[in-house]
Amino acid sequence: MKLQRQPFEAIRLEQKTIEMRLYDEKRRQIAVGDTITFRCEEEKLSVRVIALHRFPDFAALYAALPHSKLGSTDPKDMVQYYSQEEQRKYGVLGIEIERMTL
């Protein structure tokens, strides 16, 4: 999965442990125990999925999950990536992760 620099670094530093995505067809394939490789430019970072949190929209996700794990405190931040219409159509997913040790 591609990430912008700020969330990539927050995950690398273990300051962000829940990645938020639209619950589209691609994300429906994710299961607890899966490995996800995040990419930012040429860098890669592998994590393990430890929990999945489904919600109807990002407002509900932000209301239920600790902001300290999300890397952001405002659900409106996600509108730049996913419209309200997309959120209503698919729902959203909080992918709880842990860094993998080599």
Locate predicted features.
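A mature extracytoplasmic/lumenal domain signature
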Residues: 24, 51-53, 99-101
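Short beta-strand-centered aromatic/proline hotspots
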Residues: 44-54
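Compositionally biased, charged N-terminal/linker segments
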Residues: 1-29
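Glycine- and charge-enriched low-complexity intrinsically disordered segments
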Residues: 65-102
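Short, solvent-exposed secondary-structure boundary/capping segments
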Residues: 53-69
